[in-house]
């Protein structure tokens, strides 16, 4: 049964292209959950989700906002189509807040603290992680080729602190060495990167080929290789990568227990999943049941995949790996267990094709397709129902003084629903509702009641191409 939105937020004059929700650090004086929205003209707005009023709006750039991330309750990062990733910090309490308890007078402002060029000539987003002490890690597409990955670190507010630790990471050579012709029988390569998503310490990459590859980075944790006689798996020719070539002429007596190589900033591949092969991965969301992800494609299927626990643990507690148990590329930066297999994950039918958006809230899965319809189901159920579809006006406005007696066929074929530009959700987990309420003890009973009613529900927010944002309850 289709569900009506509880409210619509209206301020943007162009289509919504990015959404993100969160809770601002209480030191900043904002006493409610917030929603960040960006549109195709570069306008960014921060909404108070209880009053449903904007507390900040500004034109960040003249291009589309591609993706928004909110970290640590005070850092806002924006990726825009002008090929720049901007990082902002909320200003201190005394400088930004006009205390009105809970009303529309609460205001925030943003201060830009970092900017870095990023390749946006593709579909992919990025992953930004706060490392502590004003340091950040950035995972994004390679500057010149969206088939590859770059990993950076930087420290704010030092603009010259940007350092690239991994350049143009290419998974394909190692995967071909390991899996041969079984990897991509119908395609020449993995294709461009379509989506990044990070769960705990693991970064998932969805590719144009439909493959999902997950990796973890050993940051500031040196790995040591223990050389073992023999070579890994089948013999690898001279054109291939991997440490097998290094081991073909080893002396058994002298190599059995020698830690001969120390590696820094190693990337370990921990999952290879066919997922949607050969259809492209369109979106990803966390899978709370398996500590993995849910990914969508142009078909009506969702794929639920996760990393096996044995690979989450790493080589061992001493960070020593045996040469006959792991493949190592020729640059000594990529590592993969020889026991790793191509996964075939659980598949879920969501009753609609072209699932451009997927979201998980507890055990709910919400999907949005290209035609503007939203479906909702549960992770462990085969049923999904139509949840939302915002009707658009069927009356086309023609500003020309000259009429047209012939009906435009393109109007007849266009969708009767407003298309979706972005989706996000909000839920307060476990004991967080009580924690959030404790932080707001000074609110009046009525305002506390409104806040409590909001945080007890699971919410999803849909940004439409007409500039409106719908607020929906998942229950």
Swiss-Prot record:
It comes from the Eukaryota. Its main location: nucleus. The gene is ASA1. The keyword Aminoacyl-tRNA synthetase does not apply. Component of the ASTRA complex involved in chromatin remodeling. It is found in: Nucleus. This is ASTRA-associated protein 1. Belongs to the WD repeat ASA1 family. Component of the ASTRA chromatin remodeling machinery complex. Keywords: Chromatin regulator, Nucleus, Repeat, WD repeat. One of its GO terms (biological process) is chromatin organization. GO terms for cellular component: nucleus. WD repeats lie at residues 11-57, 60-98, 443-475. It comes from Candida glabrata (strain ATCC 2001 / BCRC 20586 / JCM 3761 / NBRC 0622 / NRRL Y-65 / CBS 138).
